């Protein structure tokens, strides 16, 4: 059967109200990864995923090792997500907000397919989407089981135990 993109990726627009427990619905599935941003101003991009747990938000521009937007999301639900108690970036009063949502395989489980085992891998082979957590081993050529049926075309990584920025690989980028 053909893949219907809206069953695996959906964008939601909503207006913030600065209230804990606000349900954001209309996604059409339970997200595994949500990238959220106020559309005006200089507010940060905030990333939440099911592999690390919905409450473990990351501000994409920060280089810190720790989760830095914790509790801005309380949970993922069957049609979206619930805003948490520290929602400055994803539910500011009267802010126009966009949430890009991807469907994966839920909270995930360990994966031993590569030379580095993952702690959690949440993959949806129909969508070609996977998100995982793992501990690197500083070995050139190491592989990580991603749960997909073919090699990923886009990869984004971020250290969780040390300061540093994101690294992004795209199949079309042939420059080092």
Predicted regions and their residues:
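Surface-exposed molecular-recognition determinants
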Residues: 1-176
